[in-house]
Amino acid sequence: MSLNFLDFEQPIAELEAQIEELKSVGNRGQLDLNLEEEVQRLTTKSQELTEKIFSDLGAWQVAQLARHPLRPYTLDYIRMIFTEFDEMAGDRSFANDEAIVGGIARLDGTPVMVIGQQKGRETKEKIRRNFGMPKPEGYRKALRLMQTAERFKMPIVTFIDTPGAYPGIGAEERGQSEAIARNLKVMARLTVPIVCTVIGEGGSGGALAIGVGDRVNMLQYSTYSVISPEGCASILWKSASKAPLAAEAMGVTAERSKELGLVDSVIPEPLGGAHRHQEEMAVRLKRQLIADLGSLQGLSHEELLDQRYRKLMSFGYC
């Protein structure tokens, strides 16, 4: 499977291409040479180079990884982490927005409501999922699922991965801002545990609408910001080409969000990013979700709401 190497990974890509070429020659038996030693040498060199590059990534490089086309999406994690997933559709008012997926599932045997934004892989799916940008009906579907979880006393797990809420005219006419605001209000008052994880892009209000939780996590190479680096650059410098500078200035990385107290945990990704070792990433994420829910399950409704309120009110203060 092609790893779709990013620009800053090109030295790694060149080594991997050499390795694949040598393996291909060896498999065809065209040369009476022992290629195993050379393949091993190049593999070791590729590993060392990957470690070196990924030990010093800038904010813009992290932003590129957060958008990687092979990065696991919500439905991938649902498949790898949960069992007995039963998807629920529609907002019971207008339509079913497929940019938001959710339903009842089991996490290590415990019934939970899992909700997340879903991007697409191929062109048709990207269009069907609206490139992971939910409309009001998507957020109202998420709200309906969260209220169902409240009714049946199920913990809520959300996966955040969106460039932002859809800014189209129709979405605005149907109350995009109201839908986001209502979700924030309701999530702050739910009496069941809520664990949120940014798995890719955490874009502005579109991310916050399913991001109010008792525990908020970020994967190591995910981002969280009020606007995309390109959008910020277009406003401040009148050119999207300044996106790398904007990414650094905004502090979009998980490490920076943790320093600011905006998230509780940064979940390490396998070397090279979650897309290279999806199953391993799922194991790490599952472990964190189970630990978070375990720490919250023993709290009373009053304790849960008090902790959540204090957490929200601490934002913006030293």
Swiss-Prot record:
Broad enzyme group = transferase
UniProt EC number: 2.1.3.15
Q: Where in the cell is it found?
A: Cytoplasm
Catalytically driven reaction(s):
N(6)-carboxybiotinyl-L-lysyl-[protein] + acetyl-CoA = N(6)-biotinyl-L-lysyl-[protein] + malonyl-CoA
Q: Which GO terms describe its biological process?
A: fatty acid biosynthetic process; malonyl-CoA biosynthetic process
Q: Which residues form the CoA carboxyltransferase C-terminal domain?
A: 41-295
Molecular function (GO) terms for this protein are: acetyl-CoA carboxylase activity; ATP binding; carboxyl- or carbamoyltransferase activity
**Transferase as UniProt keyword:** yes
The text of the family note is:
Belongs to the AccA family.
Q: According to its record, what are the GO cellular component terms?
A: acetyl-CoA carboxylase complex
Protein's job: Component of the acetyl coenzyme A carboxylase (ACC) complex. First, biotin carboxylase catalyzes the carboxylation of biotin on its carrier protein (BCCP) and then the CO(2) group is transferred by the carboxyltransferase to acetyl-CoA to form malonyl-CoA.
Query: What InterPro entries does the database record attribute to this sequence?
Result: Acetyl_CoA_COase_a_su (IPR001095), ClpP/crotonase-like_dom_sf (IPR029045), COA_CT_C (IPR011763)
Q: Which NCBIfam families does its entry note?
A: accA, AccA_sub, PRK05724.1
Which protein, by its recorded name, is this? Answer: Acetyl-coenzyme A carboxylase carboxyl transferase subunit alpha
Alphabetic keyword roster: ATP-binding, Cytoplasm, Fatty acid biosynthesis, Fatty acid metabolism, Lipid biosynthesis, Lipid metabolism, Nucleotide-binding, Transferase
Fill in the subunit field for this protein: Acetyl-CoA carboxylase is a heterohexamer composed of biotin carboxyl carrier protein (AccB), biotin carboxylase (AccC) and two subunits each of ACCase subunit alpha (AccA) and ACCase subunit beta (AccD).
- Lineage: superkingdom: Bacteria
Gene3D superfamilies reported in the protein's UniProt record: 2-enoyl-CoA Hydratase, Chain A, domain 1
Pathway annotation: Lipid metabolism; malonyl-CoA biosynthesis; malonyl-CoA from acetyl-CoA: step 1/1
